[in-house]
From Swiss-Prot:
A molecular-function term among this protein's GO annotations: S-ribosylhomocysteine lyase activity
Any Pfam family hit: LuxS
Record family assignment: Belongs to the LuxS family.
Cofactor dependence: Fe cation
Protein name: S-ribosylhomocysteine lyase
Gene name tied to this protein: luxS
EC number: 4.4.1.21
Gene3D superfamilies, per the entry: S-ribosylhomocysteinase (LuxS)
PANTHER family: S-RIBOSYLHOMOCYSTEINE LYASE
Biological role stated in the UniProt entry: Involved in the synthesis of autoinducer 2 (AI-2) which is secreted by bacteria and is used to communicate both the cell density and the metabolic potential of the environment. The regulation of gene expression in response to changes in cell density is called quorum sensing. Catalyzes the transformation of S-ribosylhomocysteine (RHC) to homocysteine (HC) and 4,5-dihydroxy-2,3-pentadione (DPD).
Binding site for Fe cation: H58, H62, C125
Organism: Helicobacter pylori (strain P12)
Binding partners and assembly: Homodimer.
Length: 155
């Protein structure tokens, strides 16, 4: 039986046919004034086989959200997937996949040098007790170790 087409792009992705880690264009929208929004699926873990623990994911979210903007002024958002296997990177008016990979690489290298998780306090975070710098670094290191595979989605 054929699965009906869904409104959410990732629900139409056959998660059994991908090979994490990878970075793929998940969506591209053009606004009425010509602006282009590109959403990337930045997958760290193999769907339905592994996932990121919440404190590590949460800390990597904070670190990347802060650090990536040092490398790219076109970043709109870096947000975690509910399935805990990756993140979505949303950019504005920048449609160069190779440059996005380079920015992600530089950002992950900077994560490895971090001495603290930014905004991991009760004033700036909704779950401040749920962080681990070492866990975030482990995720970044494992992702970087497979840098040569990021463009190989497997679909």
């Amino acid at each position: 039986m054929k699965t009906p087409k869904m409104n959410v792009e990732s629900f139409n992705l056959d998660h059994t046919k991908v090979k994490a880690p990878y970075v793929r264009v998940a969506d591209r929208k053009k606004g009425v004034n010509g602006d282009v929004i590109v959403k990337y699926d930045v997958r760290f873990k193999q769907p339905n086989q592994d996932h990121m623990d919440m404190p590590s994911l949460h800390s990597l979210e904070h670190l990347v959200a802060e650090i990536i903007r040092n490398h790219a002024n076109y970043v709109v958002d870096w947000s975690p997937m509910g399935c805990q296997t990756g993140f979505y990177l949303t950019v504005l008016n920048h449609d160069n996949y190779t440059e996005v990979l380079e920015v992600l690489e530089k950002t992950m290298q900077d994560v490895l040098k971090a001495t603290e998780v930014p905004a991991s306090n009760e004033k700036q975070c909704g779950w401040a007790a749920n962080h681990t710098l070492e866990g975030a670094k482990n995720l970044a290191r494992a992702f970087l170790d497979k840098r040569a595979e990021w463009s190989e989605v497997g679909v």
